[in-house]
């Protein structure tokens, strides 16, 4: 018997015990039981009804989000000329992003309180970016960035940093990446946010700042045996780029 089943059986035993005590009390206090019982029944109906409705909405939101993701991942006609009949394609990435965006926005508007709805808002921001609608993208991603869920907020901040970099607002991008680098998100691990920050510094010509950040990642991202972690390996490569070989140099 797995742990989940044991927990469920324990809850059922507790419920049975409480019910038995309740029946004994009701036999001795009939009038009070009628009055209190009516109120409790109403409360239970509200709670159970609300929980059922929330589950139903979450499932509906997940299905709608899945449909939107299917559109977002649909093949482009130029990349898949021999697509089987019935498979929808798009002429280019912008058209695909626009179609998916409409669906993501609808899911976010209708199911915004559910987790799929929150992820739909994030994807709405991403697809706005791909459409070139920077204003709408910023608005959506700012909302995601302020989410109470740290992992969801981190996704919003990372995408927003990318948007700001595209817009030439590097100072704003740096602040977001610095914030992510100090966090503990699982969706945007701190070390990888720091790598992004180093790359941004490098693109701005701030080589000393880039090397400083990469060196910090290289020194800190290690396992228990002192071996470099994934981010540490990337940081090491950034700090010590391999020169192009003779064959590569001739081909350039």
Feature map (PLM): residue ranges:
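Terminal, low-structured helical/coil segments at or just beyond the last alpha-helical repeat
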Residues: 23-24, 28, 203, 207-252
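Short solvent-exposed coil/turn linkers within tandem alpha-helical repeat scaffolds
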Residues: 107-117, 131, 146-155, 181-190, ...
């Amino acid at each position: 018997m797995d742990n989940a089943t044991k927990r469920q059986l324990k809850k059922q035993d507790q419920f049975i015990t409480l019910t038995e005590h309740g029946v004994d009390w009701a036999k001795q206090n009939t009038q009070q039981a009628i009055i209190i019982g009516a109120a409790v029944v109403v409360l239970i109906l509200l709670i159970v009804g609300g929980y059922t409705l929330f589950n139903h909405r979450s499932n509906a939101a997940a299905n709608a989000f899945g449909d939107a993701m299917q559109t977002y991942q649909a093949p482009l006609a130029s990349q898949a000329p021999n697509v089987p009949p019935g498979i929808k394609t798009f002429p280019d990435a912008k058209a695909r992003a626009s179609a998916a965006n409409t669906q993501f926005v609808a899911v976010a508007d209708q199911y915004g309180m559910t987790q799929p709805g929150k992820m739909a808002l994030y994807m709405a921001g991403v697809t706005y970016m791909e459409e070139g609608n920077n204003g709408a993208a910023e608005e959506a991603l700012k909302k995601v960035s302020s989410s109470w869920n740290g992992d969801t907020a981190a996704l919003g901040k990372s995408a927003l940093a990318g948007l700001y970099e595209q817009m030439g607002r590097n100072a704003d991008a740096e602040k977001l990446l610095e914030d992510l680098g100090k966090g503990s998100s699982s969706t945007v691990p701190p070390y990888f946010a720091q790598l992004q920050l180093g790359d941004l510094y490098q693109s701005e010509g701030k080589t000393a700042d880039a090397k400083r950040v990469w060196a910090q990642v290289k020194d800190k991202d290690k396992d228990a045996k002192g071996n470099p972690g994934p981010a540490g390996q990337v940081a090491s490569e950034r700090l010590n780029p391999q020169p192009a070989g003779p064959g590569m140099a001739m081909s350039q």
